[in-house]
């Protein structure tokens, strides 16, 4: 297995995401990413499966209980990826071969699993991407183990 770290825009000491490959199978993990940048997009382009941050809904952050400095941090380019930007990034990644994504690192205070899923899937569908056929979208939950995804021969499928 080949593990390739790549830089991500986050306000931590040398933060990285990861791209994994084994033969023709590829997957990536990109969370704690403040914004869409060509560097990390290039690193996960072509990955069949991704764990991708959909941290927050901008409206929930702006009108939520967090202090102003924390809101600025979350919404900043080195903070966390919002649902809409996640959707825009995923659309490009599906065009490069991504078949399955787990929406991850959802904020407990500034997002809802259904909201993240509906925002991302709605944007994909409006752009002509068939969710379920062109790409599988799932939400990684904080409170339990997610469904298993099996990658084989360049295809992804849910485990039986």
Regions found by a protein language model. Name each.
Residues 1-49, 143-144, 148-160:
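Core dinuclear metal-dependent hydrolase active-site scaffold
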């Amino acid at each position: 297995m080949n593990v390739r770290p790549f830089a991500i825009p986050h306000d931590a000491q040398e933060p990285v995401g990861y791209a994994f490959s084994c033969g023709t199978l590829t997957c990536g993990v990109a969370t704690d990413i403040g914004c869409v940048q060509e560097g990390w997009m290039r690193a996960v382009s072509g990955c069949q499966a991704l764990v991708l941050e959909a941290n927050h809904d901008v409206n929930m952050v702006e009108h939520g209980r967090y202090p102003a400095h924390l809101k600025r941090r979350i919404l900043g380019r080195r903070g966390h990826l919002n649902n809409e930007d996640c959707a825009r990034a995923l659309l490009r990644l599906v065009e490069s071969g991504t078949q399955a994504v787990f929406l991850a690192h959802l904020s407990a205070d500034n997002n809802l699993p259904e909201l993240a899923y509906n925002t991302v899937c709605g944007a994909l569908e409006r752009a002509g991407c068939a969710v379920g056929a062109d790409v599988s979208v799932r939400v990684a939950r904080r409170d339990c183990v997610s469904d298993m995804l099996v990658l084989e021969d360049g295809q992804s499928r849910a485990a039986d």
